[in-house]
């Protein structure tokens, strides 16, 4: 599980939500996952197309992040569910 921070994945995920993650090293195009890119961790939708691989926010005010071969990139897992952080006693 991972606590969401920021508004880039609204309206589906909000700050304080807890995302449930299935640990795996690959996900399908269009799925939401947890990614490591150049020292930062992201919850984003993966877009793998003819113009490149991108991490895409659901909130349209954020631009897609292109992934280059020279980047340090890792897939941590697929987001399989969520709940409000307040629904989990003791989870901060």
Predicted regions and their residues:
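Acidic/glycine-rich C-terminal interaction modules and beta/coil loop segments
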Residues: 1-92
């Amino acid at each position: 599980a991972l606590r969401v921070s920021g508004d880039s994945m609204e309206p589906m995920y909000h700050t304080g939500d807890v995302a449930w993650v299935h640990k795996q090293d690959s996900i399908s195009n269009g799925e939401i996952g947890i990614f490591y890119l150049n020292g930062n961790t992201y919850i984003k939708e993966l877009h793998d197309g003819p113009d490149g691989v991108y991490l895409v926010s659901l909130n349209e005010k954020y631009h897609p992040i292109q992934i280059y071969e020279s980047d340090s990139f890792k897939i941590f897992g697929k987001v399989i569910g969520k709940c409000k952080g307040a629904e989990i006693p003791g989870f901060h």
